[in-house]
Amino acid sequence: MLLCADADAASADLASGALACPSCGAGRLRPWGRGRERVIRLRGGATARLSPRRGRCGSCRATHILLPSWMASRRADAVGAIAAAAVASALHGTGTARIGADLGVPAATVRGWLRRLRVRAGAMRQDAMVVFGRLTAGCDAPFPEPSGSALGDALSAVAACAHAAITFCGRTAADWEPLLGLFGLARFLAPAPGS
């Protein structure tokens, strides 16, 4: 799976052979159809239907899905909804029943998101801080402040990356949720293998 903040640009890169294979690193990905259609719940109750592009490596023959970073692998809800739940819990102390009611999803779903993010919070924060350092190299950007919880610190680091990409790298505020996914939430939300 390749996460892409800009699905149209990623499709163009796939068509031109500009994407390197993440499996072998030697080959280039070429278009190889589409993945299965997914219905994703968005914040506010709307849904989106998407059949993500698939690429196949010319060297190792591995296939990879190009997943827009506003989605998370094997999750029915968009990163924006999951991020809102994580912020409400980690930074405001809101309970899962209330978060679920506000988002229109079962409390058990919210508990699953939060459980996965809490387990991976340290790694997510570490990765986000490395990216933050790259995005802000040579710039006067403040480091994210500690929040008092591992998940809160991870969310602050991911948000700092998204803010840095908007401030220093020409992204726009419309890219906020895809950037949150790209800088950690989509990847670290993936369910554990075999679950």
Specify the residue positions occupied by each region the protein language model found.
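Residue-level marker of intrinsically disordered, low-complexity segments enriched
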Residues: E37-R38, G80, L103, A164
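Long C-terminal interaction/binding lobes of large macromolecular proteins
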Residues: M1-D6, G17, A123-S195
